[in-house]
UniProtKB/Swiss-Prot annotation:
Signal peptide: none annotated. Component of the SKI complex composed of at least SKI2, SKI3 and SKI8. The SKI complex interacts with SKI7, which makes the link between the SKI complex and the exosome in order to perform mRNA degradation. Residues 382-397 have a biased composition (Acidic residues). It comes from the Eukaryota. Disulfide bonds: none annotated. This is Superkiller protein 3. InterPro entries: Ski3/TTC37, TPR-like_helical_dom_sf, TPR_22, TPR_rpt. Component of the SKI complex involved in 3'-mRNA degradation pathway. Represses dsRNA virus propagation by specifically blocking translation of viral mRNAs, perhaps recognizing the absence of CAP or poly(A). Essential for cell growth only in the presence of M1 replicon. The keyword Transcription regulation does not apply. PANTHER family: SUPERKILLER 3 PROTEIN-RELATED (PTHR15704), SUPERKILLER COMPLEX PROTEIN 3 (PTHR15704:SF7). The lineage of its organism: Eukaryota, Fungi, Dikarya, Ascomycota, Saccharomycotina. It comes from Saccharomyces cerevisiae (strain ATCC 204508 / S288c). TPR repeats lie at residues 4-37, 47-80, 425-458, 471-507, 508-541, 627-661, 702-735, 736-769, 945-985, 987-1018, 1226-1259. Gene3D superfamilies: Tetratricopeptide repeat domain. Residues 339-397 are annotated as: Disordered.
Length: 1432
């Protein structure tokens, strides 16, 4: 022992001398002798902490050893402060904490040091300051710091009050641990989430297991428990308890299933305790109600709900619960509940209770404000309806309204707040119960499914055990399956009931549900059997007895059913809405049983019906919103009392209350449709379709869809009607009426082909359906199938001869067919059909007495057709038209009659009118008669405007046709009237512009400009404006307008025709000719103006132009002009100028027979005009035509008639000396000379030729003609004279190709060799310009012939070779050289060849294929036929 003391003295001395190494060595020797030596540990701690760092040992190692020795010394003698002071001096001067010593170890030592200081009654200030400094400089020590300040720890008990309150310490520790826990859970989940499949059913459970690994060792729950127990502030404790509950629910979700159940019990007990003490935690209240497994929603703790609602009036769950209490469908009396919940007056409360009351009153005020806002309008309405004298009752009613909610507001609150309670089971259960009680099964379905999912989620996540709620949702789902989409889901409903019964065999609701399914299936026997068993099991259940009695009634046990229902009615005691509804239902069932009983016994006195009637009245008095009562009452009025007005009212009331009442809806719809009021019928049908209760009926009855479709057709909303008709056909594909309606909709939407197919389907289903055939015919007409359409309509009209619509439809198709034929150029056929149309109209007006406006419009169209085709106006059925107008009532149109004076009486009295004039007057009358069946002033303004427009068009047509000014004035008057009534119609402005074109240029221009503003793309407006400009010689303006028109309608012939007229006016003959031809081609030769202008232009280009008759191109153009004029004459047969053009054309084409007919017609027209006017100009024109007629007779070989006409013409114009007269005189002399020549009167022939030469010696054609005639006489002297005339012409006028060729031909015929040599040289020396003129190569031919006669060889072939060099594409040249090349050139289209010539060329190849081509080109070619025969 003395050695130890000595060593300690030495160590102390060395320590004083700061020889730390020696101190360490001595102290270690002491510890070897005495391991628990207090001072040795202190000396070692001091020395080691003071020892500087060396190469072998680090300073941290020394500090660690020093710390351990200080701690060891403190543990050996805790009450000795020396070691503690050295240790904490070390802590203060070095970074031992936290580098060597952890925070937990440090704070443990702090607690022990504080305890030693306390025992020694020493100051703790320095220690406290050290702790605070450490906390400040080392923020990461917070967790350990607060861990050691938990109540019960040594540090907390000694110096905790100086550092923090226990409440703050626990609260801060909870926050720190919660943050750490949340961070670790998030990190773990992010690491493992991707390792799991989201589709895995246990995905969430597996994720929770990762969280549980972190949470299971957590002390947060215990800390919350400690904190709650020590909190004195109620509000603070309430907040902490709410946080604790949230944490516990979080822990509950992460727990494994095996431990979740026990912990859920703890959490649930905590929630119940919190609610018991009226806790401020909203979550606790929500979970309390959600986790309470109510057997019946009518047995909830209503006062507690009121309390909950007043505490949290804005909470969605509270509002839903309160609305359920307020609903008339629940068993609660909200008024009594509210009254019982009010505190008694004068009750004294403590200060704390007063504060709570203030809060409750504030909440109550919020509730009232909320309720008052929702029912404000209804309160005002109720107050207004009260009697002013009952002021006290009014105030009481107002108070009643303020308590609870109205039923409409209940629905609003439920539907609005369920969105905010998506995860609350009880909220879904309440809403589902409400929907089921109101029989809105389809609306309940999604909430039932959500509720079942929420239960499964709560069981899996929280371990919630709600067997009763789960059973109720299963029953609700089965109930919905019973009624929604029945009977599709009946099997699913039965399985649900069986599952419930497997766990609870005595469940009355499940058994009753199965019975109701049997009732819905009309399986009354099984229903009665099952419900009998249920009734025996529960004899006091009135619902079971009611359903059983209803089943017995349908099985024929009427008396038993009535007795059972009477028992049910007597057993109903409650006065809530459900009880009242149940009483009304059973009274209705009794009434139905009486009606069934009446039907089974056929009671003539209708006693049972009277009983049923009384019961129904009673049920309606009990519950005026019971729809089946009104519906059945309607049945009685309709079928038994025959009072259809009251039946309609009852049905309407029933349907107003229940949009799913199929019987009421059908009766109301049929009533509206019979009026017809399709819009009202559609509204009823639409409501029936939208309602879910009638879906079972709508699976087999499609009339509601058809009614809605028809209503859309009536509103001209055809595209919307299509889907309704399609829906109707999905229900019943054999419904003909729906097919017809669908076809009409397709037709109106422009889908004509589809409509035809649909009508075919309807006809296939019912061939006798006349309307389907009628509509098909109309559709066929729209696609241009007029013949098939007419065949169908003829049959339909025969089957239903008195149906006006069919007859009018036939007239329409006939009219459209005739117009279509007219547009295609089939004018005569068009007129024929127009006549049939008039006869049909006669039947409609005379026999059917129908004066539909459309009929008069159709009559106007066909009459206009006769005016357009004047050649057939004599076939106009005047007698039928007279009959039509005489059988029509016409009040007269004095305004227009005073202008045109057209009436049926004046028309019949007139004897001077021609056929065209009569047709025009009938056209005007047809326009006037179009509104003769009603008072004109009562018609809508737009209709009157169209009436005046139709009259204006008819008057304008008459003016254009007859050129009589009174019709123009009448047209202007009518158009102005139409514009006054409706000024936004471009057609009226166009008509007025045309009518005023000859009167006032500015007015006409204004009208056309107005029309273009209203309808900028209307081509006829621009064309008329251009013609107006051209009429005023403003070609530049007209050209600009036509350019605009060409951009709008380049395929239209009108702008091209206008451009041609402009170019003609400007003198561009070539350009105008091309455009006239282009316009004629674009119109397909059907435009009247294009026909006439093209023919005129062709004649201007080819008359007096020296064209050879052998030119195919000229003949082609003249032939086309002839055809154009032929079509023109069908429309305007008496056009004088057109007839003259046609005579010229036919004369050039040598069609003398046709020309003769036209000449006779033209002469007759001129004679009539001359007789009527006695105008010398008409006589002059007559003479000109007579001269032309003489040429036609000359062509026909009628020489004497030719002489007669020529003499007559010559006599009339003998004194005239103008150019036209001189041409006619020359023509007359030629006709006379040639006629006398062919009549062998040579003297007269010579006289006429001498006269001819005296008039004109400059015409080479006249000289050649005379020479040919003289040469043809055959006398040598006449031949000499002929040659002499030709040579004289050459001497005076110079060399001419025609004259030279004529001399050559005469010389060849006379075989004058001395002259032939000279002529040959002249022909060979012809310049190239003359050879170009010689298109038919007459010169090479004559050279060849002369060569043969002079040299007797084929050297003349060289001239053809030379011509081939200059003219390689000339067929005549290659005809002499090579037939194959000639055929190839002809077939390549390089030359115009007639079909017969081409056919001959093909036949000459002696090839079968070529011969067949020749036959195809020209079947009348005899040569081709012979060649083809030779091939076989």
């Amino acid at each position: 022992m003395s050695d130890i003391k000595q060593l300690l003295k030495e160590a102390k001395q060395e320590l004083t001398n700061r020889d730390y190494e020696e101190t360490i060595e001595i102290s270690e020797k002491v510890l070897k002798l005495d391991p628990d030596n207090y001072f040795a540990h202190i000396f070692l701690g001091k020395a080691l902490s003071s020892l500087p760092a060396s190469n072998n040992v680090s300073s941290n190692r020394n500090l660690e050893r020093a710390t351990n020795h200080y701690v060891s010394a403190a543990k050996l003698v805790p009450d000795n402060l020396l070691a503690w002071k050295g240790l904490f001096l070390l802590f203060r001067t070095t970074e031992v904490v936290p580098d060597i010593l952890s925070y937990d170890e440090y704070f443990d030592l702090c607690g022990q040091y504080a305890d030693a200081l306390l025992k020694q009654e020493q100051s703790q200030v320095e220690l406290i300051n050290d702790i605070k400094l450490l906390k400040k400089t080392h923020p990461d020590c917070q967790k350990a710091f607060y861990q050691h300040l938990k109540p019960g720890s040594l540090m907390a008990e000694t110096i905790g009050r100086h550092l923090s309150t226990p409440q703050d310490a626990l609260l801060n520790l909870i926050k720190i641990l919660s943050n750490i826990e949340t961070t670790e859970i998030g990190k773990t989940l992010s690491q493992n989430r991707l390792k799991l499949k989201a589709s895995d059913p246990d995905y969430q459970i597996k994720l929770n297991s990762f969280s549980w690994e972190i949470i299971k060792n957590s002390e947060i729950d215990q800390l919350y428990n400690q904190l709650v127990n020590i909190l004195a502030d109620d509000q603070k404790r309430s907040e902490i308890e709410n946080q604790w509950l949230e944490y516990r629910i979080k822990v509950l979700k992460s727990m494994p299933l095996d431990v979740k159940k026990d912990f859920f019990t703890k959490v649930k007990e905590m929630v119940e305790d919190m609610v018991l003490v009226n806790h401020q935690s909203l979550l606790a209240w929500q979970k309390y109600f959600e986790w309470t497994d109510y057997e019946d929603l009518d047995n909830m703790d209503a006062p507690l709900i009121i309390k909950y609602f007043k505490k949290f009036p804005k909470d969605p769950l509270a509002m839903i619960l309160y609305s359920w209490l307020s609903s008339k469908l629940s068993k609660y009396d909200i008024k009594s509940l509210e009254s019982a919940n009010k505190p008694p007056e004068g009750h004294k409360k403590t200060e704390k209770e007063t504060d709570i009351k203030d809060v409750d009153e504030t909440n109550e005020d919020e509730v009232k404000d909320r309720v008052e806002d929702e029912v404000k309008d209804r309160v005002e309405d109720e107050v207004k309806d009260q009697d002013e004298e009952a002021k006290e009752d009014e105030e009481e009613d107002l108070d009643d309204i303020e308590i609870g909610l109205l039923e409409e507001e209940v629905v609003t609150v439920l539907t609005e707040n369920i969105v905010k309670c998506k995860n609350n089971i009880l909220a879904h259960r309440i809403l589902c119960q409400y929907y089921l009680l109101t029989k809105e099964y389809e609306a309940a379905l999604p909430y039932i499914k959500n509720g079942i999912s929420l239960i499964a989620y709560n069981i899996k996540d929280l371990g919630v055990h709600l067997p009763l709620t789960k059973r109720e949702f299963s029953l609700d789902l089965a109930t919905v399956y019973t009624y929604v989409d029945a009977p599709k889901d009946h099997n699913a409903a039965l399985k649900l009931y069986d599952n419930i019964l497997s766990g609870d065999f005595s469940n009355i609701q499940a058994k009753m549900g199965k019975g109701i399914i049997f009732i819905e299936r009309k399986n009354w026997k099984d229903a009665m059997t099952l419900l009998t068993q249920v009734h025996e099991q529960s004899p006091n259940n009135l619902e079971v007895l009611s359903e059983l009695s209803w089943s017995k009634a349908h099985m024929g046990y009427m008396d038993e059913a009535l007795a059972g229902l009477d028992t049910v009615i007597k057993g109903i005691k409650g006065m809530d809405l459900r009880s009242i509804d149940f009483r009304a239902l059973n009274l209705w069932r009794q009434a139905k049983v009486y009606i069934m009983k009446h039907a089974s016994i056929n009671d003539a006195k209708q006693e049972n019906v009277k009983c049923a009637f009384k019961l129904l009245i009673q049920s309606i008095k009990i519950l005026d919103t019971f729809a089946p009562g009104f519906s059945t009452l309607g049945d009685i009025y309709c079928h038994y009392y025959k009072d259809h007005l009251r039946a309609f009212k009852c049905y309407f009331k029933a349907f107003d209350l229940d949009a799913g009442d199929y019987t009421a809806a059908k009766y109301i719809t049929e009533t509206y449709a019979s009026k017809p009021n399709w819009q009202a019928a559609s509204s009823i049908a639409s409501r029936l379709i939208k309602g879910e209760k009638a879906k079972a009926e709508l699976r087999s009855n499609n009339w509601p869809f058809r009614v809605v479709g028809i209503a859309h057709l009536e509103k001209q909303e055809e595209s919307d009607s299509i889907e309704w008709f399609q829906s109707a056909l999905r229900v019943d594909p054999n419904d003909v009426e729906s097919w017809v309606g669908l076809g009409q909709a397709y037709h109106a939407c422009g889908r004509i082909e589809a409509s035809i197919k649909v009508f075919d389907k309807a006809i296939q289903l019912r061939p006798s359906h006349t309307f389907a055939q009628y509509f098909k015919a109309i559709s066929l007409c729209d696609v241009g199938e007029y013949l098939e359409s007419l065949d169908i309509l003829e049959k339909v009209c025969q089957e239903a001869a008195t149906e006006e619509s069919f007859q009018i439809g036939l007239v329409e198709v006939l009219m459209r067919c005739s117009l279509d034929l007219y547009s295609q150029g089939f004018l005569l056929k068009s007129v024929s059909i127009a006549k049939d149309t008039i006869e049909r109209i006669k039947i409609i007006i005379s026999e059917l007495k129908c004066e539909n406006q459309q009929v008069w419009i159709y009559l106007s169209q066909v009459l206009r057709l006769f005016i357009w085709i004047e050649s057939k106006v004599d076939t106009l059925p005047v007698e039928s038209l007279v009959s039509i107008f005489e059988n029509s009532q016409f009040s007269g149109s004095e305004e227009i009659d005073s202008v045109d004076n057209i009436k049926i009486d004046t028309l019949l009295d007139s004897t001077t009118d021609d056929n065209v004039s009569i047709a025009c007057k009938f056209l005007i009358l047809a326009s006037k008669y179009s509104v003769s069946d009603q008072k004109f002033t009562d018609i809508a303004g737009t209709v009157r405007a169209s009436y005046w427009y139709n009259i204006g068009i008819s008057e304008l047509t008459a003016f254009i046709t007859l050129k009589e000014p009174q019709y123009r004035d009448a047209a202007i008057f009518a158009f102005k009237k139409s514009i006054q009534l409706q000024s936004n119609t471009s057609e009226t402005w166009i008509g007025l512009g045309i009518a005023t074109m000859d009167i006032n240029f500015r007015v006409s221009q204004h009208c056309f400009i107005k029309a273009t503003a209203l309808e900028p793309k209307a081509t006829n407006t621009w064309f008329n404006l251009a013609m107006l400009g051209l009429k005023k010689k403003d070609t530049e303006f007209a050209q600009q307008v036509l350019n605009k028109l060409q951009s709008l309608a380049p395929q239209d012939s009108s702008p091209w025709l206008g451009m041609a007229l402009i170019l003609e006016e400007q003198g561009d003959i070539i350009g105008s000719s091309k455009l006239f031809a282009h316009s004629f081609i674009l119109s397909n030769g059907r435009s009247k103006a294009a026909q006439f202008m093209y023919a005129k232009n062709v004649l201007e280009n080819h008359i007096n132009n020296g064209d050879d008759e052998r030119d195919i191109e000229t003949v082609e153009k003249l032939t086309t002009a002839s055809i154009a004029l032929e079509q023109f004459f069908k429309k305007s047969p008496d056009s004088q100028f057109a007839l003259q053009c046609a005579l010229l054309t036919l004369e050039r084409l040598h069609h003398y027979e046709n020309a003769n007919e036209l000449a006779n017609r033209l002469i007759g027209i001129l004679e009539k005009k001359f007789e009527k006017t006695q105008d010398e100009r008409e006589l002059f024109n007559f003479a000109i035509i007579k001269g032309q007629f003489a040429r036609i007779h000359l062509g026909l070989g009628n020489f004497e008639l030719s002489i007669e006409n020529a003499d007559l013409s010559q006599g009339i114009i003998s004194e005239s000396s103008d150019e036209k007269s001189m041409k006619t005189k020359i023509s007359n002399h030629i006709c006379l000379g040639l006629s006398y020549f062919f009549l062998n009167d040579f003297d007269q022939t010579l006289n006429q030729f001498q006269e001819l030469l005296s008039i004109s010696k400059d015409s080479k054609h006249l000289v050649v003609l005379i020479a040919k005639v003289l040469y043809d006489v055959g006398e040598s002297d006449t031949k000499e004279i002929a040659l002499q005339e030709l040579t004289e012409y050459i001497a005076t006028s110079g060399a001419d190709l025609l004259v030279t060729l004529t001399i050559a031909a005469m010389s060849i015929l006379d075989d004058k060799r001395e002259d032939l040599s000279i002529i040959l040289e002249e022909l060979k020396a012809l310049p190239l310009s003359k050879q170009i003129i010689d298109k038919h190569k007459d010169a090479p031919y004559l050279i060849e012939e002369i060569t043969k006669r002079l040299y007797r060889n084929d050297t003349g072939k060289q001239v053809w070779q030379r011509s081939a060099y200059f003219f390689p594409n000339n067929l005549k040249v290659w005809e002499r050289l090579d037939k194959n090349i000639q055929r190839r050139i002809a077939s390549n289209g390089q030359n115009k060849v007639t079909a017969e010539e081409m056919s001959k060329l093909y036949c000459e190849s002696k090839n079968l294929r070529s011969i067949q081509r020749g036959m195809f080109l020209c079947p009348w070619n005899v040569t081709a036929v012979k060649a083809l025969n030779e091939c076989f």
